[in-house]
Amino acid sequence: MLPYTVNFKVSARTLTGALNAHNKAAVDWGWQGLIAYGCHSLVVVIDSNTAQTLQVLEKHKADIVKVRWARENYHHNIGSPYCLRLASADVTGKIIVWDVAAGVAQCEIQEHVKPIQDVQWLWNQDASRDLLLAIHPPNYIVLWNADTGTKLWKKSYADNILSFSFDPFDPSHLTLLTSEGIVFISDFSPSKPPSGPGKKVYISSPHSSPAHNKLAAATGAKKALNKVKILITQEKPSADFVALNDCLQLAYLPSKRNHMLLLYPREILILDLEVNQTVGVIAIERTGVPFLQVIPCSQRDGLFCLHENGCITLRVRRSYNSICTTSNDEPDLDPVQELTYDLRSQCDAIRVTKTVRPFSMVCCPVNENAAALIVSDGRVMIWELKSAVCSRNARNSSGVSPLYSPVSFCGIPGGVLQNKLPDLSLDNMIGQSAIAGEEHPKGSILQEVHLKFLLTGLLSGLPSPQFAIRMCPPLTTKNIKTYQPLLAVGTSNGSVLVYHLTSGLLHKELSVHSCEVKGIEWTSLTSFLSFAASTPNNMGLVRNELQLVDLPTGRSTAFRGDRGNDESPIEMIKVSHLKQYLAVVFKDKPLELWDIRTCTLLREMSKSFPAITALEWSPSHNLKSLRKKQLATREAMARQTVVSDAELGAVESSVISLLQEAESKAELSQNISAREHFVFTDNDGQVYHLTVEGNSVKDSARIPPDGSMGSITCIAWKGDTLVLGDMDGNLNFWDLKARVSRGIPTHRSWVRKIRFAPGKGNQKLIAMYNDGAEVWDTKEVQMVSSLRSGRNVTFRILDVDWCTSDKVILASDDGCIRVLEMSMKSTCFRMDEQELVEPVWCPYLLVPRAALALKAFLLHQPWNGRYSLDISHIDYPENEEIKTLLQEQLHALSNDIKKLLLDPDFSLLQRCLLVSRLYGDESELHFWTVAAHYLHSLSQAKSGDTVVTKEGAPKDRLSNPLDICYDVLCENTYFQKFQLERVNLQEVKRSTYDHTRKCTDQLLLLGQTDRAVQLLLETSADNQHYYCDSLKACLVTTVTSSGPSQSTIKLVATNMIANGKLAEGVQLLCLIDKAADACRYLQTYGEWNRAAWLAKVRLNSEECADVLKRWVDHLCSPQVNQKSKALLVLLSLGCFVSVAETLHSMRYFDRAALFVEACLKYGAFEVSEDTEKLIAAIYADYARSLKSLGFRQGAVRFASKAGAAGRDLLNELGSTKEELTES
């Protein structure tokens, strides 16, 4: 049998409570899987899976307004490890960048003293992963190096900046939301500030007038047009228009390029920035609850919306191909009429009051299948999306188009029997919305699903102050087997919260009183007394509540029975050292003494009894001598059984009978009534000493008042030391043995409480004042540490106690309870020292070498020919402690994830994708998503299952294409269809001539000449562009392929381009099918993204590949340095050998080796001498990197695969192995 152990280790920690209004937007969910939020001046870090507090960061001196986790969009290795970095900003303009795992500030940044409006890490991390952009009020944006705290540049703007948003598709695009409108910046760069003032636009809406209310009945396109009354203009709105200044939020849509949303309380506007117009409005019905916040998804075109009642809703864009027209109306000829987001799921609302309201929402950036709600009272509610297959009856009951589960899982289409985890991420839950007008492929098995929110995590904060705190009796050798470090916290609403201080979790919440708890005293390790008093009536009388609570059962008993109504309020309760007796002190009523064991009143003092200002029980008693007497009695009784009756004298017999009676009584009550004594002081400072034994109370001695002391407010007694505190801040130390006293003026005003630390011989004492606290050594009569509210300490102390012999507990008015070292310095702790109830999966907590070795262990299954998650079987000669930590991480994985990792049918590509999700590795997730898609496409084409179209994309992939959030990386055919759908919507929504002209330009580039001509002919005769548009319409319809006309148009186009009219020249070249030339011109003039777009929509696969390869060279150039983007473009082109070469040249050895293995499996490499050399070099370099991680077994595997290139390393590894086995 294992020895019974009790965990009583208590770490320094902070229990947090309700939030401050400034903390409203201070929350972020990192790629690392952790949620950070601001609570007053603290930053709290919790695990999203288990809802456990992992860290509380304390260094800010003011309220936190923003927190942001660093992005993980870079290649991780020993030099750039997995680490927990977080930036937090406060109302005084200070930004702190933290190493969260160690709990230390890496750097502090200060520019101005006004609240930081917004702060974000740059998402493109190829050049540097340390760049942080901040808004310093009123109108500055500053780029910082967050590693060193260096200011790189600063730029001011004309208007006050409220927030900003980076374009997730282009790192050079940044948009500012200002008090006046929106500013678009298109030349953002880490190396220098933006050049000009940016392009400023205003959002406005017409005034409602009778003319607007009497719109003619409209159908089709006009009907949709009338719904959009929002204009985006570069001029300030005129008097006829209302500027929409109440914009709550601005954000780019990560699901499709050049789209942005603007959030207003009652509507969400979707803008298409290509034509600068509103293409969709999500409005709330009149009775609906207004929006507070919206988070757009990237994996699917969906929106997480937070409403004012705390309800989170998920809206997903409707797919139109599955809607059948059932009405008698004529069906619309144009399939796309409206950009509609259907409500797909919503969670329960919270009860909103004056003090309890939703603050903010964050969404899991890795999987986009969970949202966390931060409530003002300190609660964190984690809602997870779950998918369920619809039953036939439930289908289409709501009237919205159905959602289907995707064909593939982790990037690869799987069979019906393959293990899947549909709730892994949003894109594994629901398939893509098909492009409008496109039917689902015949014969494909589509399962209709519906989504629901499930509350999977709840973290509750402390209620708002006031607090009365009391630590349970201390650990001793006698209670070591049952001891738990419990802290009782009395609250203002009458409940008592009991916290387990090893884990910091709420152990029990007990509703004990009907009003504020004034004090708590423990009567044993499992029971306590608490008291409260109602508001005084006109006579100053109250209803006193004194309850005895049994913790295991939660049962609460009125300790004083029916007493308590209409009497003077209880001032304090004091439990004797042996927990036998209770002294109850009232404000204007004599003292009561009670027996705790029997709940009986021993004595109510007479009315002449002096008023008590302070009282304390003595630690000395006569229990030991009583026990000795009891033992002697037992021995005498034992002797009595041996001696004959005749030999007994009459006197001895009567003594024995009395002792037997006493013994039986003691056994009945299971307790001996020992003599205990206490001291108290009156208003004059006189000290009284009383003795209590059984039901007798005796007055022992009186000590006259000390002239140097004011009115005594508190007493503490331990061993031979008695300490008194007074109203004037004096502490008087009495040495009872030496009969000397020493008065110390602390100059700290009223001494509110003094308490000795637990532990034999520990003479430390904590004293609490109005403005702070001090720890004293009463042996030396010296102050050990001090804490004073003020500039450096932002909180005021409400109550104090000792947690252990060397740690104190402070309850403060910021709603927090801090467990601190005796120095009382607020310090963060190392996260790996935390005692957690549930294991937490977070490889970021491991040392860098171990985190990377664990990743290799998961990726390269099976080991020793079998799939295993037991690392002890692996030849990994690190110290046992690290191996134990790795095994703990593996145990923390969910059973569903373990099942996938141990599945032999789970392919290498799927494993890479899953591990990138588990690690929250943004860079790897994007790489393996695109790699899996195109490698699988290639294998399908090679196997002959599909016909390869001339664009190079197998046809079956068009029914399961790469998500449009990957933009130009998608298959050409799918990309073209998406662009046509988009221009359809733009055409339907156009509301001005300017919009019409932009639509015409797009249609001409897309080759939709007939529709372009229709729009050109719509120009009215009084428009200044009427003549040009008419001629252009004639030109477009009469363009022939004859040599002379082509030559003329080409000459005009090149002249236009040379004279600064690039867009017009490109358009003319597209008219004569010279789109390849147009792309070259665009690239020459630096319009690389536009050239890629045009190549995708107009060129055949070979020409398109040429354009994109030139773009790759540009992206890899030192001045651009976007190699990670270049890798994705090469993957989309099927240039797999080039990808492997580039990965190797970038020293991404782990990714290169895995990619080579996947390519060999899918037959993606043409075998040649060069490729074989490349593969051997990659394997050898990867083996060396595994050796540097200490992962010898992995190093041996890849060194042996590298052939001649790995021979030396293999010999080296072999000799190391022999040395180890010999030792």
UniProtKB/Swiss-Prot annotation:
Subcellular location: Cytoplasm, Cytoskeleton, Cilium basal body; Cytoplasm; Nucleus; Cytoplasm, Cytoskeleton, Cilium axoneme
Matching Gene3D superfamilies: YVTN repeat-like/Quinoprotein amine dehydrogenase (2.130.10.10)
Main localization of the protein described in the UniProt heading: cytoplasm
PANTHER family the record matches: WD REPEAT-CONTAINING PROTEIN 11 (PTHR14593:SF5)
Cellular component GO terms, alphabetical: axoneme; ciliary basal body; cilium; cytoplasm; cytoplasmic vesicle; nucleus; trans-Golgi network
Disruption phenotype: Mutants show retardation of growth and development with mid-gestation embryonic lethality, delayed puberty, reproductive dysfunctions and obesity. The rare mutant survivors through adulthood exhibit abnormal digit separation and syndactyly, as well as shortened limbs and hypoplastic skeletons with reduced or absent bone mineralization. Their head show a diminutive and curved nasal midline and a small lower jaw with microcephaly, closely spaced eyes or single/absent eyes. They have hypothalamic gonadotropin-releasing hormone (GnRH) deficiency and pituitary dysgenesis.
Disulfide bonds: none
GO biological process, one term: head development
Protein name: WD repeat-containing protein 11
InterPro entries per UniProt: WD40/YVTN_repeat-like_dom_sf, WD40_repeat_CS, WD40_repeat_dom_sf, WD40_rpt, WDR11
WD repeat ranges per the UniProt record: 59-108, 111-154, 354-393, 470-509, 565-604, 707-744, 746-786, 792-830, 892-939
Domain of life per record: Eukaryota
Xref: SMART domains: WD40
Natural source organism: Mus musculus (Mouse)
Annotated function: Involved in the Hedgehog (Hh) signaling pathway, is essential for normal ciliogenesis. Regulates the proteolytic processing of GLI3 and cooperates with the transcription factor EMX1 in the induction of downstream Hh pathway gene expression and gonadotropin-releasing hormone production. WDR11 complex facilitates the tethering of Adaptor protein-1 complex (AP-1)-derived vesicles. WDR11 complex acts together with TBC1D23 to facilitate the golgin-mediated capture of vesicles generated using AP-1.
Expression (tissue specificity): Broadly expressed in various organs including brain, eye,ear, lung, heart, kideny and gonads. Cerebral cortex. The entire developing central nervous system, except for the spinal cord, reveals expression. Expressed in the neuroepithelium, including the diencephalic region that gives rise to hypothalamic neurons. In the adult brain, intense expression is restricted to the olfactory bulb, the olfaction-related piriform cortex, the granule cell layer of the cerebellum, and neurons of the hippocampal formation.
Subunit structure and binding partners: Component of the complex WDR11 composed of C17orf75, FAM91A1 and WDR11; FAM91A1 and WDR11 are required for proper location of the complex. Interacts with GLI3; the interaction associateS EMX1 with GLI3. Interacts with TBC1D23; this interaction may be indirect and recruits TBC1D23 to AP-1-derived vesicles. Interacts (via the N-terminal and the central portion of the protein) with EMX1.
Pfam families associated with the record: Beta-prop_WDR11_1st, Beta-prop_WDR11_2nd, TPR_WDR11
